[in-house]
Amino acid sequence: METENQKTMEESTEKRKEEKKKRSRVKQVLADIAKQVDFWFGDANLHKDRFLREQIEKSRDGYVDISLLVSFNKMKKLTTDGKLIARALKSSSVVELDLEGTRIRRKKPLGERPKDEEERTVYVELLPKNVTHSWIERVFGKCGNVVYISIPHYKSTGDPKGFAFVEFETKEQAAKAIEFLNNPPEEAPRKPGIFPKTVKNKPIPSLRVAEEKKKKKKKKGRIKKEESVQAKELVVDSSSSGVSKATKRPRTASEGSEAETPEAPKQPAKKKKKRDKVETGGLPESKAGKRERSSAEDEDCLPPRPKLKKRAQKDGGGPAASEVSKEHRDLEFCSTEEEKEPGDRKGDSLSKGKRKHKKKHKERHKMGEEVIPLRVLSKTEWMDLKKEYLALQKASMASLKKTISQIKLESEMETESKAPPGSGQQCSTQEKVSAQGPQFVTGVIVKILSEDPLPGRKQVKDILATISEVVYIDLLEGDTECHARFKTPEDAQAVMNAQTEIKKKHSWNLEILSGDHEQRYWQKILVDRQAKLNQPREKKRGTEKLITKAEKIRLAKTQQASQHIRFSEYD
């Protein structure tokens, strides 16, 4: 009895387990669906998404069927269940469901496109190859609320082009992204934007002029700086001489400079240098490239300057004392200017740059952000670069057009000069005939039959061309039958006369078409020609058309250059 009771208990528990439905974890899926639909029906997307905007405008009440959303690829990845989508959108702040729960629409009507859209958008380049929307949102989301992301792709391969546009909610957020995320690596190109800056590895004249103007301005600035430095050096020399003789009589800087004449003896200067070396023996050696200074200058540059000034003030502050203090101030200023030589100035600028870089890094660490090597700039700046690129493209295409027209004219002139008189009329008649198509001539077509598949069209033509001139070979690959068209009946007859030799070598059977067979074949020629002419052609316009023309000319020139030139004995 006990065993039976246990069995019944086990069966009941199993039934209960089966009856209990498995808990489906759809909370994250519902959140993802709501986020995706809110984005699709948001202001930022609808102003750019023409298809969805048209679907909303088509319906009178602005409702869109949920089945349309299910057809989108991103929604297919999340779910294909319309009821689940309706469940996810019940608490949405952007869209609302109809009474049946099968259609959705925006709660608020779509307004006009905002004017500050470009100012709120940033351009990003040097992105990783397999970049995604979620990656960009994660990186740029730390600077503000990302409203829209556009990643352009190549049509042929579908790979990302390496740059993207990120739209923020406010201008301040965009500026913050430019400040903190603009961190291009050292090996990155100097100029931003994926645009060519040269034509045939040479700068374009319009750009060259602007660059030359900039260089001239820089040169003028350098010359002015050099002049000011020279003037300061003169002031320093004069002031130093004045200070050294200040005990005898207080002098002005101009008097000191007059006293120093080029006729001064050279030996005392050498002695002075020796004294300097003896005095500064205990001190560390000065760096290479810096000017050696006299002991008087060193004394003046030492810290106890303010004491001298104080003494002068205490002594009564007479005119002599005031002049000395002025000279000291001038000397202080000039010596500091001299100490800051070009190398030191560069060092200062580098140190400032390092400080700024450190500050940025600190702020980045505060934000809790990883440093990613990206180049970020405003969309307005990128638009200016785009205009520059289009102007360059226009100029290069205009020059290409000119060169192509010149080459054509030259070739026409050459053909006219080489052609004998009266050949122009013959050429025009030939052109008319070619426009009409091949004219019916009897006894010109030879039918070739073979047991094995015939070789290529070129091989057949080469074999027959040894006997007489061939106009056309009508042959498909792998066929055992073909037709050869000759210029005159005599040429066709010559091939027929050599039939025995051809049969021995290639085992081909030849016959000239005549009667109904010939007429049918000529009709086939005309029908095939008409079908070929009526085929839809790819229309090439603008830059593509010019480039194809240039490519043809280049190929023709290379073929001409690669031809083997043979010289006769008399040349």
UniProtKB/Swiss-Prot annotation:
Fetch the CDD domains from UniProt.
LARP_7, RRM1_LARP7, RRM2_LARP7
Q: Spell out the PROSITE patterns in the cross-references.
A: HTH_LA (PS50961), RRM (PS50102), XRRM (PS51939)
What's in the GO CC field?
7SK snRNP; nucleoplasm; nucleus; ribonucleoprotein complex
Q: Which residues carry this modification: Phosphothreonine?
A: 252, 261, 336
| Residue ranges with Basic residues bias | 214-223, 352-365
**Sorted alphabetically, which SMART domains does this protein's record hold?**
LA (SM00715), RRM (SM00360)
The question of whether Cell membrane is a record keyword is answered with no
Q: What is this protein called?
A: La-related protein 7
Q: Which organism is it from?
A: Rattus norvegicus (Rat)
What gene is this protein a product of?
Larp7
